[in-house]
Amino acid sequence: MSEEKQTVEQNETEEQEIIEEQAAADEQQEETNESELLQNQINELQGLLEEKENKLLRVQADFENYKRRSRLEMEASQKYRSQNIVTDLLPALDSFERALQVEADNEQTKSLLQGMEMVHRQLVEALKKEGVEAIEAVGQEFDPNLHQAVMQAEDENYGSNIVVEEMQKGYKLKDRVIRPSMVKVNQ
């Protein structure tokens, strides 16, 4: 019986080893499945993180572009803030210049003209401080960006496409034309 008992014990031991091996294999399989599941979750979270980082970079770039655009618009607004009032003042300046061309024939008229010249100078200086300047025309080559041709002439003293006469002064505010010069151009 001892042999039988030994065989039974050996069988039980073998069964126990098989069960333990099976349990170890099952445990290892569970660990592998759990490891794969965790790795999949990590990969998914890394992809989500990368997507969010890219979105954040785009939002930051959009915000920087918005700030730059706002700054440029503000600078342009400051630069040309006086354009409307200057445009409204130009006809008055033209009238002043026409009035100053009248010849004074007595002391009262001369005195009045001197006063008007002082006011005219002050007005021109105030406009210069704002960046307004007259556009040079006579003797210059015709430039459609600066001049408006209203007449043509044939004058041998001037070359082709040269401004011969200025009918109305043109003005620029900083680098922007607010009124082109009305000119007569040589053919």
UniProtKB/Swiss-Prot annotation:
Keywords: Chaperone, Cytoplasm, Stress response. Signal peptide: none annotated. One of its GO terms (molecular function) is adenyl-nucleotide exchange factor activity. The keyword Phosphoprotein does not apply. It is found in: Cytoplasm. The keyword Metal-binding does not apply. Residues 11-34 have a biased composition (Acidic residues). One of its GO terms (cellular component) is cytoplasm. Residues 1-38 are annotated as: Disordered. InterPro entries: GrpE, GrpE_coiled_coil, GrpE_head. It holds the Pfam family GrpE. Changing residue 2 to H: In strain: IS58. GO terms for biological process: protein folding. Homodimer. Belongs to the GrpE family. Participates actively in the response to hyperosmotic and heat shock by preventing the aggregation of stress-denatured proteins, in association with DnaK and GrpE. It is the nucleotide exchange factor for DnaK and may function as a thermosensor. Unfolded proteins bind initially to DnaJ; upon interaction with the DnaJ-bound protein, DnaK hydrolyzes its bound ATP, resulting in the formation of a stable complex. GrpE releases ADP from DnaK; ATP binding to DnaK triggers the release of the substrate protein, thus completing the reaction cycle. HAMAP family: GrpE. PANTHER family: GRPE PROTEIN, GRPE PROTEIN HOMOLOG, MITOCHONDRIAL. NCBIfam families: PRK14140.1 (NF010738). This is Protein GrpE. It comes from Bacillus subtilis (strain 168).
